[in-house]
Amino acid sequence: FSETIDRNGHQAHTLIGTRLFGREDPRSHALFLLNNHIGGPGMSSLLNQELREKRGYVYTVESNVALMSDCGVWTAYFGSDHKTVDKCIRIAAAEIARLADSNLSEAKIERIKRQYIGQMQVASDHRESMAMSMGKSLAYFNEIHDIDWITERIRAVSASDLRSIAEMIHPSSWSRLTIC
């Protein structure tokens, strides 16, 4: 679907995304890694660089993954002026399509992995957050997936794994909602 809801706002809020596999799928580690590269926290994410830093089109931009037992979603959100919504969608679509069309270099993949693993290590310093994460792991998988277990799987992600995920979130599969 592609829907715009006009609420006479000063800013446009756009969500693009697609449906994916569930949380027990082994491709989830590649998905989380690629998502972090595309729109994760920090100034270096792909969409932040392209939409905010280079062009100044958005106030905020991020992408997210939500995996349930039987399915999941990948989404990207941005807040922008009304007049830049279509430009932002085209740029985001071009960036994702580029990821789906060719493998990232090994050097780029290593940088992406280091950043993601570093973010996990920083997050592990927050004991409450780690306890919640381990509790969810136990509830979902009947075992605890600690940071070492996750790091091992992130390090095993290949260029073709990332490209396969990019193909799954290709713009041709997107739905879009804009509220302005």
Region annotations inferred by a language model:
Residues 1-5, 60-66:
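Short beta-strand/turn micro-motifs at beta-sheet edges
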Residues 1-45:
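His/Glu-based metal-binding/catalytic segments typifying zinc-dependent metallopeptidases
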Residues 16, 32-34, 51, 76, ...:
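Buried hydrophobic packing residues in well-ordered domains
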Residues 18-20, 78-80, 180:
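Short beta-strand-to-loop capping motifs
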Residues 41, 62, 66-123, 145:
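M16/insulysin-pitrilysin zinc metalloprotease superfamily fold
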Residues 41-57, 68:
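M16/MPP (pitrilysin/insulinase) zinc-metallopeptidase core fold and M16-derived inactive scaffolds
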Residues 113, 117-180:
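C-terminal regions of mature proteins
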